């Protein structure tokens, strides 16, 4: 399937359009809130893995306010994963089916999108407190980049 486009906010409140990353392999890591233990661990894990995935763009998306994301990323030393806020329009959550309307949060999920905007891997984590299958997502990425 073709990856839907969406617009989220950077930690500096600048709109960011997913289509601007076309031409790269991308991991989209959806988390309910960076201020929770599993979301924290998920974002740190992808930040660590990014060093071994040259040319791969990794996006973490949550409903956290951009100010909170900026503070958290700075404190956690997140420097290889870009954090984006879906709080304004829920554009990502609506496009990818991660929006939990009653809570106005995005559920935990991981997507791998290839350079041609085709979704190659999808995981919606059924229990919000569980980790995603990192290895399955990363294996998909490695195959796409030939490493």
Describe every region a protein language model picked out:
Residues 1-147:
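Chalcogenol-based redox active-site neighborhoods
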